Design a protein with these regions (language model features):
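Hydrophobic/basic alpha-helical segments enriched in Actinobacteria
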Residues: 10, 18, 25-29, 57, ...
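Residue-level signal for inorganic ion chemistry
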Residues: 18, 22, 52, 61, ...
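Generic detector of well-ordered alpha-helical packing
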Residues: 42, 65, 83-86, 117, ...
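An extended, acidic
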Residues: 135-242
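Flexible hinge/capping segments at coil-to-helix
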Residues: 127-137
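Short loop/edge segments at beta-strand edges and connector loops
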Residues: 63-65, 126, 165, 211
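DPxDG-like acidic metal-binding loop motif
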Residues: 72-127
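N-terminal subdomain of lithium-sensitive/metallo-dependent phosphomonoesterases centered on the IMPase/IPPase/PAP
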Residues: 1-84
Length: 242
């Protein structure tokens, strides 16, 4: 019989163990580039799915790397996972990739973990604190498709925009004060933001759509057009400008 793990502990263990696995296969050096990324996606997905099947067999499951099962829509508890957020960054040796683990209950992330393995840290909703103090005067954006609205907001605030890889990495760098806001308007899916939002909201950051509406998860359509994560004192100004 396996030991019972509470939700917070299971969330942490999933993120940390997946980080260890992904760093392990990359450090072997037998694969590189796309082959390494594909292997990382598969390994992380299979590991997380098997652990959840054993420890939370009655919960729903939504992952970027698995076929969607509509049965999740009838469940109050759903795990929303991105096993490897930033596959390209991982495969090319960059540090801005992440692991997203979120338990969503009735549409809201209640337990979340975002692992940044190359930085040796897992951020947890159960122990999250946002940095306060002087502004960094920087807004983090996608390095693939930085939205025009982010540049507009940055100009109005006297800030600059700066690109970074995975959504989890961007959100966590707002949390630790390297940036003041993360603005994305190019479209994402629920697994891109459920865990980062769970951690950032627990830490006291503002998290919403760009129209100010609440971010809700476990929808039939998992597409999410835009997102804002920022220091709470900047939220009203950014939402008005956006």
């Amino acid at each position: 019989m396996t030991a019972h793990l509470d939700d917070a502990t299971l969330t942490h263990h999933l993120a940390q163990s997946t980080a260890d696995l992904l760093k392990g296969i990359r450090n072997v050096g037998a694969l590189r580039d796309r082959a390494l990324g594909d292997a990382g996606d598969d390994l992380a997905q299979n590991w997380i799915a098997r652990v959840l099947e054993q420890h939370r067999p009655d919960d729903g499951f939504l992952s970027e790397e698995a076929a969607d099962n509509p049965e999740r829509l009838g469940k109050d508890r759903v795990w929303i996972i991105d096993p490897l957020d930033g596959t390209r960054e991982y495969a090319t040796g960059r540090q801005d990739w992440a692991i997203h683990i979120a338990l969503v209950e009735n549409g809201v992330p209640t337990h979340a973990a975002v692992g940044l393995p190359d930085l040796g840290v897992v951020f947890l909703s159960s122990d999250a604190r946002a940095v306060s103090g002087p502004y960094a005067k920087r807004i983090v954006v996608s390095h693939n498709r930085a939205p025009a609205v982010a540049h507009h907001v940055a100009e109005k605030l006297g800030f600059v925009t700066s690109p970074l890889g995975s959504a989890g990495a961007k959100a966590m760098h707002v949390l630790i004060g390297d940036y003041d806001a993360y603005i994305h308007a190019g479209g994402q899916y629920e697994w891109d933001s459920a865990a980062p939002v769970g951690v950032c909201k627990a830490a006291g950051l503002h998290c919403s759509r760009l129209d100010g509406s609440e971010l809700l998860y476990n929808n039939k359509d998992t597409y999410m057009p835009d997102i804002l994560i920022c220091r709470p004192e900047l939220a009203d100004d950014i939402l008005e400008m956006a």
